[in-house]
Amino acid sequence: MKRNFERNDDDKPERKRPALASVIVEALKVDSLQKLCSSLEPILRRVVSEEVERALAKLVPTRLTTSSVFSPKRIGGPDGRNLQLHFKSRLSLPLFTGGRVEGEQGATIHVVLIDANTGRPVTVGPEASLKLEVVVLGGDFNNEDDEDWTQEEFESHVVKEREGKRPLLTGDLFVVLKEGVGTLGEIVFTDNSSWIRSRKFRLGLRVPSGYCDGIRIREAKTEAFSVKDHRGELYKKHYPPALNDEVWRLEKIGKDGAFHKRLTAAGIVTVEGFLRQLVRDSTKLRAILGSGMSNKMWDLLVEHAKTCVLSGKLYIYYTEDSRSVGVVFNNIYELSGLITEDQYLSADSLSESQKVYVDGLVKKAYENWNQVVEYEGESLLNLNQPERLDISQTDPVTALASYSTVPLSQFPEFAIEGYNQTLTTALPHNPQAQFDFVPQQDQFIGIQQPQTQTNIENENVTRLVLGPPQSSTGGYQDIKSSADQENLNPFEDWTNLSENDFFSEEEIRQTSHDLLANEDMQQLLFSMGGGKGEDGFTFPSFMQNTPMMQGYDEEGRGRSGKAVVGWLKVKAAMRWGFFIRRKAAERRAQIVELHDNNDGK
């Protein structure tokens, strides 16, 4: 029996053992399923919770009193208004976790309550002082920019924090309206937006439950935006970029990307280096980046780079060892101006002939950049700038101190065609007299014929005065007696003169035209350069000794001093024309007003 029993056991087939690979696969499946369940659980819990809350919200009104059942929320206000909340500020993007939510350029974010029927803010009533709640919406809410949505649609897109995470939005989450306008406080995102379907958020504003029962106020929403992890802020672009920023801080240049590597290989590692190469040879810079950068990308890159704030560092390239003439560059090697014999001319003020000359110097400087030196002298603003020489300025003594001892014998007269008399500035003919020109502020300088020159002596100062204006018969009015000359007052009230004492507008125009068309005047203006000052007059370049200024170095004065003297005479002639024109216009206005008053009586 025993043997038979053992035989029966031996006859049973042995159980097949599983292979090691199949065991591992089964274990991985179980582990994956457990992980999937653990990840789905918080999502399912949240969805179920939201659905339960929504179902309860629908059931609550049926349990209230009959008065509440038959008074549903209206779309507008009690007087038919269509009330809507609106954000009036755009957000500063990109946003990072832990960073404060701000408006563009750090501005405050404002919200306003408006009546959509009129488009005007609601400033009165209980709605104008509501308390609002800030919430987070999914970026896919109202993608069609439909202006009409229901409260249920808005609430269904409110985003809550992830399971086990901090509240998605922290800070001051309530806004109180004052006369229909409110300001968002300090709010911060604690989580990024990469975990939701749209991968973007929106900020929303709503009226909390319990406020304005029976009145529907449409909620506000911002544009969709991404919230990145704060660790990504290390790779953030700078607006505007700084000169010492690494070049990948610029738009379209990714850190350790292809463009970044090409620029680094070419020795361009900072924004300053990028701008310098852009100024000196933009074609070469474009070639360094290669064909992978499109024209649109290039334009955006250059536009962003040019927003960089420059420092005050200057460089200068001298044309000769004497260092009397040189071109000035800023710290990105862009032309700033020209220095010639202690005179500084900005690049914008150069005449066409000067620009041709300066362009040659700039090219030579770029070719011999090792000879360019950093400017370590005084500020260029402290150098004599001819465009700033204004004889009507408050302190003319300082501006013209170096020209106060030029002998009057050196002043040439201007022969103006079309006139019977020779014009000259109202200066004494005494060759021993010194040019001590100190006009008062707002005092106008005129032109007189030699026979009518008038001097006003006050504290040993010789002043230039404006002779009486021309009558309508044409020509310059003569002074009848020396007594009249002595009684002339440059500060007298010209409005007391009769209408016939002033030029007509046509005569003034013809006078100015003849004055500027004169050959000597044109020669002087051409030789003195073509820049323009603040008042529209040209000013000298002081780059060369013009024919009109030759022969005036007997007293050892520099060429620039003689040019300024000639310029003052030209400016006096110009001011004379403008002064007469203005006074004539004022006089005509007074006459018209007087006639209107007489007609009214």
Swiss-Prot record:
Interacts with calmodulin (CaM). InterPro entries: Calmod_bind_C (IPR046829), Calmod_bind_M (IPR046830), Calmodulin_bind_N (IPR046831), CBP60 (IPR012416). It comes from the Eukaryota. Residues 1-74 are annotated as: Calmodulin-binding. A motif (Nuclear localization signal) lies at residues 1-8. GO terms for cellular component: nucleus. One of its GO terms (molecular function) is DNA binding. This is Calmodulin-binding protein 60 D. Signal peptide: none annotated. Transcription activator that binds DNA in a sequence-specific manner, likely 5'-GAAATTTTGG-3', to promote the expression of target genes. Belongs to the plant ACBP60 protein family. Keywords: Activator, Calmodulin-binding, DNA-binding, Nucleus, Transcription, Transcription regulation. It comes from Arabidopsis thaliana (Mouse-ear cress). The keyword Flavoprotein does not apply. It is found in: Nucleus. Expressed in leaves, stems, flowers and root. Residues 144-267 are annotated as: DNA-binding.
